[in-house]
């Protein structure tokens, strides 16, 4: 399976422009892909403006569904979601080309950015099976809390974390993501944004590791419709190689047992 991570330069609170930017990038994908991953809050940036929140009938999920169908590719990304007009979640959607989807609500809300004052935290994990591979979904700050993303019972093959992780803390990304890959005996894919917003500066820092902690990404750059140079990382997920490694080095069988108290 081919996975592409897009380090989108997100236009601040401009959904339509971000949709156009992404479509222009997808138009330039060479050799296609099975899964295209966008950063956290890809349609708005890391906003606390809850008036931008949508439900499942809103334009962002509908755009994800139509775009997945148009390009015959699964798409993942998050946006501010509300169901009842009161609670708002930082919700990631994993949308398949046939229009079906799964979602994950961010568990660990970034209090240093006051996300916890505006958003409601999630309490359910999400594992998506697509083309025979199981993906566990995480969002940004979740990467710092390994218990939450622990591959308990060997339930997933790939851990995906989508983020708005600022340049000032860029040094933490590599050890955190690589550790998640090694300790969970899984692939780990981290997808960060690029550009600037009202609070932070970002830089291309998406990363992909195999189950041994080896870097496996191929890097390329394309220009979006706004002229922004966009980093794309790609990798192949080899389920047979992963299964063989787990059979030959079954450290997962000696993992500690635990339960998370909500």
Regions found by a protein language model. Give the residues of each.
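Active-site-proximal beta-strand elements of phosphoester/diester hydrolases
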Residues: 1-14, 91, 133-142, 160
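Hydrophobic residues at beta-strand termini and immediately following loops
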Residues: 6, 104, 128, 191, ...
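Cys-nucleophile CN-hydrolase/nitrilase-fold catalytic domain and related Cys-dependent amidase chemistry
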Residues: 15, 23-97, 103, 166-186
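Short, acidic/polar
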Residues: 17-27, 143-150
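CN hydrolase (nitrilase-like) catalytic-core segments centered on the catalytic cysteine
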Residues: 59-76, 144-230
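Short beta-strand scaffold segments in enzyme catalytic cores
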Residues: 77-79, 91-94, 126, 206-208, ...
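Active-site catalytic loop in hydrolytic enzyme cores
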Residues: 83-154, 168-175, 244-251, 261
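Short, basic/aromatic-enriched C-terminal tail that caps enzymatic domains
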Residues: 232-234, 239-262
């Amino acid at each position: 399976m081919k996975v592409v991570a897009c380090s989108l330069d997100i236009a601040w609170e401009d959904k339509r422009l971000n949709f156009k930017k992404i479509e222009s990038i997808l138009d330039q994908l060479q050799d296609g892909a099975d899964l295209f991953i966008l950063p956290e809050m890809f349609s708005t940036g890391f906003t606390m403006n809850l008036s931008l929140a949508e439900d499942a009938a809103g334009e962002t999920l509908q755009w994800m569904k139509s775009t997945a169908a148009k390009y015959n590719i699964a798409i993942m990304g998050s946006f501010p979601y509300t169901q009842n007009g009161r609670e708002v979640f930082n919700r990631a959607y994993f949308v398949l080309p046939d229009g079906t989807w799964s979602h994950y609500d961010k568990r660990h809300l970034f209090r240093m950015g006051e996300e916890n004052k505006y958003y409601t935290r999630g309490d359910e994990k999400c594992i998506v099976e697509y083309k025979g591979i199981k993906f566990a979904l995480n969002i940004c700050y979740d990467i710092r809390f390994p218990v939450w993303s622990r591959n308990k019972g060997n339930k997933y093959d790939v851990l995906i974390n989508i983020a708005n992780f600022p340049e000032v803390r860029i040094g933490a990304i590599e050890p955190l993501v690589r550790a998640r890959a090694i300790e969970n005996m899984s692939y780990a894919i981290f997808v960060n944004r690029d550009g600037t917003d009202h609070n932070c500066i970002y830089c291309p820092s998406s990363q992909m590791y195999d189950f041994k902690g080896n870097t496996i990404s191929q890097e390329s750059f394309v220009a979006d419709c706004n002229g922004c140079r966009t980093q794309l990382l790609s990798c192949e997920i080899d389920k047979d190689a992963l299964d063989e490694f787990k059979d030959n080095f079954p450290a997962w069988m000696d993992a500690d047992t635990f339960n998370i108290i909500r």
